[in-house]
Amino acid sequence: MRRLINHIVNHDLFRWSVMTAMIFYRYSETCMEVTVRVGDPVTLGSGHGYHPGQKVHWYNQSCVGISNGENTHPICTYDPPKPGRRKTMKTTPLPSPLLYECHNSTLSILHVNVSDPKNYCRRKCPPNGNCEFPTCFTLSLISRTTTTRKPGQKTTLSRLKTTPNKHTQHKRSTRRTSPRDYNVTGLPKGFADSFTGNVEAHRAKDAAHSAWILIVIIIIIVVILFFFKIPQRLREKWDTRGYLYKGTDGLPTTDYLS
């Protein structure tokens, strides 16, 4: 036990362990989940944490690979305004109609489609070119349980929001709508029919903040211990026979405390 403590203190293994944990935490693919209903707008991210002058890039893919410098094209880039100029927002490529809007550190999807649920990645780049670690967001859709028709029962309309077929679009009809008038094939599992907001995103953000606070507390404790030389004093107390510290003459010494 004493040899293990001596090895840890002499080689600063605890400090390297803390640094390694911080690096793994930053590179981990922990995405903030946001659920939304099809057809509604949604905003990813928040305005907090944006520093003036930062250029913010948004990608509709996972952050893995983007942090490694792979050649990827953003779907939206917020270019901060220069003195005397208006704000600029660029989308790549420019869609028609406009699908995304980005401002500061947020991305707004103006109309959520069934193809939108996926991972989105945000990367902030200050003017000096040293971009921050990317942040991952997951957009998902949720749905309610649909009801089915049983023999002898009246037809129950599905509560699943669907898209009419081409022959029923732009037509007004007074007859009762039947589920046969809708095309429900090809819709992905998990089609949305309710909106829960950004509760999951806030929970993930709170968990990330808690982890960082814990790491900072551990670092502060380690600094205090080494400032008051507590590990060295404990090592001297346990090393009653002078195995760990010996002077040039081979006898136990306490010069390391001076």
Curated annotation (Swiss-Prot):
It is found in: Membrane. One of its GO terms (cellular component) is membrane. Keywords: Glycoprotein, Membrane, Transmembrane, Transmembrane helix. The chain crosses the membrane at residues 208-228. It is a single-pass membrane protein. Belongs to the RL11 family. This is Uncharacterized protein UL10. It comes from Human cytomegalovirus (strain AD169). The lineage of its organism: Viruses, Duplodnaviria, Heunggongvirae, Peploviricota, Herviviricetes.
